């Protein structure tokens, strides 16, 4: 179902394997429960650490603390230790994947990213249900323009492609406005649908909850500008960074 491209072609072959697996997912419930691995990045800019060092001890302690939280709001930004051994963790779960699903995604993401990037101080991993970033630098309310990738549905749209692209843009921008309504329980997240004759277009947008509404707008506008490059004329697509993401499909993919 999916083909994929990333800014740095680190794990394209893995994404293609995931794409083929998604082709056989029988229903929406399975899609949400499988919590498919999407992508990861071992960042070298912040260097590495050794076993038994203060950085590793701070990281292990912070993970244990976060794992005890209820995660009812699907977001954590926390730190432990003082420079140069400070550790910062940011976890954002998808808007329909809070509570136990968020806790489960954290456990999976932490185990897998530390296996894939065992000694990198900065490492990021994306799953369907969450994104986990571990870093030695605080990224609170900062838009990450460096770490992003996109995936698209291999099936092309039939009919008027330009009209479909316009409807996709319109729905995503409508959801962007909804995501920034502070009174909403699911602030920084919005999902919806749009009728397209006999079909429906489903979409969602989300920002990490540490961003201000203005920065959320900036982030979503930035990734939405990638639509022509990533997903033009495709039945589905998504762009993900550590700060914000969107997805659209011609089938329901959320538990809403």
Curated annotation (Swiss-Prot):
Q: Where is the Gnk2-homologous domain?
A: 37-139, 145-253
* PROSITE patterns in the record: GNK2
Q: Which CDD domains match?
A: Gnk2-like (cd23509)
Question: Which stretch is the leader sequence?
Answer: 1-30
Q: Highest taxon of the source?
A: Eukaryota
Q: Where in the cell is it found?
A: Secreted
Q: Where is this protein chiefly located?
A: secreted
Gene Ontology cellular component terms for the protein in this record: extracellular region
Repeat keyword on record: yes
Sorted UniProt keywords: Repeat, Secreted, Signal
Q: Which family does it belong to?
A: Belongs to the cysteine-rich repeat secretory protein family.
What is the name of this protein?
A: Putative cysteine-rich repeat secretory protein 21
The organism is: Arabidopsis thaliana (Mouse-ear cress)
């Amino acid at each position: 179902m999916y083909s994929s491209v990333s800014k740095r072609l680190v794990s394209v072959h893995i994404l293609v394997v995931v794409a083929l697996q998604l082709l056989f997912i029988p229903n929406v419930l399975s899609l949400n429960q499988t919590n498919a691995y999407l992508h990861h990045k071992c960042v070298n800019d912040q260097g590495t650490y050794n076993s038994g060092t203060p950085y590793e001890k701070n990281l292990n302690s912070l993970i244990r603390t976060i794992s005890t939280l209820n995660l009812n709001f699907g977001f954590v930004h926390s730190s432990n230790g003082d420079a140069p051994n400070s550790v910062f963790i940011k976890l954002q779960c998808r808007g329909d994947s809070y509570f136990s699903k968020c806790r489960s995604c954290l456990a999976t993401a932490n185990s897998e990213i530390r296996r894939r990037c065992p000694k990198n101080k900065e490492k990021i991993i994306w799953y369907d249900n969450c994104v986990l970033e571990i870093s030695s630098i605080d990224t609170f309310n900062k838009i990450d323009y460096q770490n992003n990738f996109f995936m698209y549905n291999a099936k092309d749209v039939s009919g008027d492609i330009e009209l479909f692209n316009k409807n996709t843009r319109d729905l995503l921008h409508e959801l962007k406005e909804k995501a920034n309504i502070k009174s909403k329980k699911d602030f920084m997240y919005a999902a919806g649908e749009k009728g397209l004759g006999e079909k429906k277009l489903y979409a969602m947008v989300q920002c990490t909850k540490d961003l201000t509404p203005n920065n959320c707008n900036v982030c979503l506008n930035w990734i939405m500008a990638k639509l022509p490059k990533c997903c033009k004329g495709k039945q589905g697509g998504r762009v993900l960074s550590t700060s914000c993401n969107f997805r659209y499909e011609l089938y329901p993919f959320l538990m809403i």
